[in-house]
């Protein structure tokens, strides 16, 4: 951006801000301003409801009203405006939150306290949070930082807890019935979403039912073009190059990206008596097919689809107050979750063969916890959980000329009949040392098992079995400097056991093809964080500094590099023979990795009508040691972590007059450039550049890539809503007013250009 355009942008922004403040504050005194409170209640930080201001953890809570105003089409998009989160998208209809430099299986996801993660989750960004529809949610809690002590394996980067619509019991026996409806339209994707729901009940019976359907078209981008190279890399350019570079092509919009889906949720609750209740929930998601754009745009594949992406969840929860003398409350949940994922591929070099792989994971879960305040000045939470995965996997190859199918029932992406399980016991104590000082202490013991038979592909690999134990802990401090200002600190350890994706998968990735890797160790980490939390009448906010070190971080290594000078096993040779133009990778442990960062967020009430909100995040990662040695200082990429988030943030001004049915919001989102690239980033077709060879990338003296990486970006946006009578709400969101073309770091698709989203909701 030249200085003239940049100057105009800042002048426009400051003019809008000044105009809003002057217009809205006319005739008002400070005494008329409404007070705000840090009334956010979180469950995920302590596995029991507690005010976030009084916890040592870094937590964000997104309430139902906020989600309705954001008008997201998939659940990960709701998190894009949350401090500390980079909402990556490999393709449309999918999204993966990156917390503190980690994503995929290093971030734990759960729905209604039932674990969503299973043993097939991969290391990079995945699509599984998108299988929870944004309609019918009550709130989302984001716990940043390690919490294996409460949630077990995988909670290294953080925990994202999604809660479905709560059951509402009446105060009397009269039966109530409330219909719900929502229509949503988006212009940039020609998207349509429709939802119908029903909730009601009596004083001892409550239910909630909702279902939605959605259909989206191709994605319209901002001004400019995508310039693709035949080495699978690309760049965003403002004008068409004339002439085009050799072996390159131009794309104005990104297609084919149309997709559709359907979901449904049903909940039923019954109060047995005043101290006991039981609830049941069924949830389903159906996504018939979805194109993976970064595989198609590179012309590597003629067809690459997730087909299908389905999920079913059924659980029952029993809750009891005072079941025995020293227990205040207890909860037990029994669950079964089924996830079916299919991949459909046609390579550009072999148009006569279609390859389909189907992986179905059935997960049985049992969890329970109890809360006791029988000891003076403390609250104890203890419990355990058990999860068991059973995997069915197969491959179907079809000759498109003859329509003859060849079925391999022994192996899809994984060996058929593989299994994984983990058993956990935990306890945590909150101790009030005195009125201004609170300590939180806890620990968890985990035992895990993996089993897979690889002998059908290579008898030398045979039956793979791995088990182990881990002990993790947590210590937190909350010190009240004043009634409205807390100093908090937290030290926690976390771990992640290798899963089936680490050890047994044969899968196409953005770098090449992953192959089985049996000789890897669990990841472990420790994190120290400290900061301030403010809760004043007209300002709430938080500032957090953190430092993490991860031992044995699992990362890809080219198989030829790992077996340098040695003969490759038959399995690897066979995979290479099937994919002669694709590099094969296995997993290995990185000795020591460091991630540091700062997270800032705050809300200020300027007067009774105008509120300002903002947040910012900086993340820095570094590999300290690998194979017993520090990285080569001349190879800048060797010390970088994968997908390090750029400095990013948001600032917003919201106007809402007291007792008025309408509101509006102007906000700016953006990120600085990210040119701190790892070897995997340089090879990744989703990250801009001209070459996939790190040795051909130019770097400056600070180790920043000069001709690769993600440029900085910002968008100007408007959002508003009005209540039409007592039953109908209309919300509108205008994104990317300047129609800029940009892509989030690590994403496989560009973000929409000028985009109008309209949402019409009613509750009869």
PLM regions: where:
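Outer membrane beta-barrel strand-and-loop segments of large Gram-negative receptors
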Residues: 359, 363-370, 422, 517-521, ...
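Flexible loop and strand-edge segments within Gram-negative outer membrane beta-barrel domains
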Residues: 255-259, 271, 275-327, 338-362, ...
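N-terminal periplasmic accessory domains that precede
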Residues: 75-78, 95-98, 110, 127-130, ...
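Gram-negative outer-membrane beta-barrel transporters
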Residues: 432-439, 447-448, 546-549, 571-573, ...
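Short acidic/polar hinge/loop motifs at secondary-structure boundaries
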Residues: 116-146
């Amino acid at each position: 951006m030249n200085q003239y355009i940049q100057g105009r942008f800042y002048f426009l922004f400051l003019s809008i801000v000044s105009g809003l403040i002057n217009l809205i504050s006319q005739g008002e005194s400070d005494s008329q301003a409404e007070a705000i409170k840090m009334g956010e209640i979180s469950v995920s930080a302590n596995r029991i409801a507690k005010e976030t201001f009084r916890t040592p953890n870094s937590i964000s809570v997104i309430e139902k009203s906020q989600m309705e105003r954001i008008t997201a089409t998939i659940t990960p998009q709701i998190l894009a405006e949350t401090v500390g989160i980079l909402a990556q998208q490999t393709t449309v209809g999918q999204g993966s939150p990156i917390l503190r430099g980690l994503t995929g299986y290093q971030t734990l996801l759960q729905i209604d306290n039932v674990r969503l993660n299973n043993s097939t989750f991969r290391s990079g960004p995945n699509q599984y949070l998108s299988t929870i529809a944004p309609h019918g949610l009550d709130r989302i809690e984001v716990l940043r930082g390690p919490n294996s002590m409460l949630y077990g394996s995988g909670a290294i980067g953080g925990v994202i807890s999604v809660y479905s619509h709560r059951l509402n019991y009446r105060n009397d026996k009269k039966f109530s019935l409330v219909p719900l409806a929502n229509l949503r339209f988006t212009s940039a994707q020609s998207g349509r979403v429709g939802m119908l729901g029903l909730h009601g009940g009596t004083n001892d019976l409550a239910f909630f039912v909702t279902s939605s359907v959605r259909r989206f078209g191709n994605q319209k981008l901002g001004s400019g073009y995508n310039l693709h190279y035949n080495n699978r890399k690309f760049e965003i350019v403002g004008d068409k190059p004339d002439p085009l570079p050799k072996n390159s092509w131009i794309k104005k919009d990104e297609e084919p990206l149309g997709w559709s889906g359907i979901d449904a949720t049903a909940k039923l609750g019954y109060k047995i008596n005043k101290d006991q209740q039981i609830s049941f929930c069924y949830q389903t998601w159906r996504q018939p097919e979805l194109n993976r754009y970064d595989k198609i745009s590179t012309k590597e594949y003629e067809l690459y689809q997730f087909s299908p992406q389905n999920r079913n969840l059924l659980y029952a929860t029993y809750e009891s107050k005072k079941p025995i003398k020293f227990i205040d409350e207890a909860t037990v949940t029994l669950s079964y979750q089924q996830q079916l994922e299919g991949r459909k591929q046609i390579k550009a070099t072999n148009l006569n063969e279609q390859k389909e792989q189907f992986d179905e994971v059935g997960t049985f879960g049992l969890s329970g916890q109890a809360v006791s305040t029988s000891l003076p000045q403390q609250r104890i939470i203890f419990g355990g959980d058990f999860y068991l995965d059973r995997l069915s996997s197969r491959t179907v190859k079809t000759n498109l000329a003859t329509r003859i199918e060849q079925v391999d029932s022994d192996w899809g992406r994984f060996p058929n009949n593989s299994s994984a399980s983990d058993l956990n016991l935990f306890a945590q104590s909150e101790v009030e040392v005195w009125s201004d000082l609170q300590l939180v202490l806890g620990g968890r013991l985990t035992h895990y098992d993996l089993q897979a038979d690889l002998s059908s592909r290579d008898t030398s690999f045979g039956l793979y079995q791995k088990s182990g134990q881990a002990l993790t802990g947590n210590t937190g401090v909350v010190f009240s400097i004043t009634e409205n200002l807390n100093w908090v600190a937290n030290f926690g350890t976390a771990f992640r056991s290798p899963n089936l994706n680490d050890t047994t998968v044969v899968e196409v990735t953005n770098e090449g093809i992953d192959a089985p890797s049996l000789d890897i160790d669990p990841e472990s980490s420790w994190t120290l964080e400290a900061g301030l939390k403010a809760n004043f009448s007209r300002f709430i906010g938080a500032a957090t500094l953190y430092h993490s070190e991860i031992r044995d971080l699992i990362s890809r290594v080219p198989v030829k590099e790992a077996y340098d000078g040695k003969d490759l096993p038959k399995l690897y040779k066979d995979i290479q023979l099937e994919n002669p133009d694709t590099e094969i990778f296995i997993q290995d442990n990185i000795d020591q990795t460091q991630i540091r960062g700062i997270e800032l967020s705050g809300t200020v009430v300027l007067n009774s009508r105008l509120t300002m909100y903002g947040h910012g995040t900086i993340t820095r990662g570094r590999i300290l040691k690998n194979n017993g040695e520090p990285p080569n200082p001349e190879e800048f990429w060797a010390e970088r972590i994968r997908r390090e988030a750029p400095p990013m943030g948001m600032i917003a001004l919201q106007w809402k007059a007291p007792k008025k049915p309408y509101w509006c919001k102007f906000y700016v989102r953006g990120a600085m450039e990210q040119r701190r690239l790892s070897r995997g980033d340089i090879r990744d077709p989703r990250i801009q550049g001209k070459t996939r060879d790190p040795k051909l990338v130019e770097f400056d003296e600070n180790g920043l890539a000069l001709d690769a990486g993600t440029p900085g970006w910002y968008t100007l946006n408007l959002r508003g809503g009005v209540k039409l009578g007592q039953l109908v709400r209309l919300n509108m969101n205008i994104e990317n007013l300047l129609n800029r073309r940009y892509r989030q770091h690590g994403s496989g698709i560009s973000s929409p250009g000028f985009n109008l989203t309209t949402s019409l909701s009613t509750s009869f």
